[in-house]
Amino acid sequence: MLKGKRIIVTGSARGMGEATLCAYVQAGANVVGMDVSDDAGHSISEKANKTGPGKCSYIHVDVSDKLSVSDSFSKAVKILGGLDVLAHPAAIQRASDASNVSVEDWDLMFSINVKGTMLTNQIAYKYMRESGGGSIINFGSISGLRPEPSASAYSASKGAVHSWTRTASGTWGKDNIRVNAILPAMATPMYYAARERSTEEENTMAHWRNNVPISLGQEY
């Protein structure tokens, strides 16, 4: 099903982006990975190329910058010969509750997580429309659906990604372009980073109890 498909994967230098890129290459797709972490990005792409059977390249991108997105996607489409799929995991997280989130962290997460989604989707849409259709897969988060007190700005940004995805899906469907979002939960690098800040079981349980807005969490 994926053999020969032409795919761009953002955030490909680690975590879900890396896993997504490798899975596509293993399925026989031709992939261009993109990230800001160039050393890791090149290394992962080279490793994926060796395992195959698909092919993989790497291009630097800053998803929050329109010129960077436009330039990198143009290069990728030339390499691939077109664009069938955009997988967009690229995101950033900074922990802070609603009372203490800084303007700087808020702006950073919305610039990368929300504006980055809008920019990459718009550019991908342009190329897909020209070739008759395609699929855009945004990466939302369970945090965008339920309260995440320790990640207030991140949760808000992912909620915005969900809303954008619904809007783009309803708008671009007429052009044979599907826009969907997947919502990862626990086993991600962001989760493990958060877990390192709370090593005791009691602290972990307290964290999840605090996710219940009126603090009525129960044990059974």
Predicted features by range, described:
Residues 126, 170-174:
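Alpha-helical segment proximal to the catalytic Tyr-Lys
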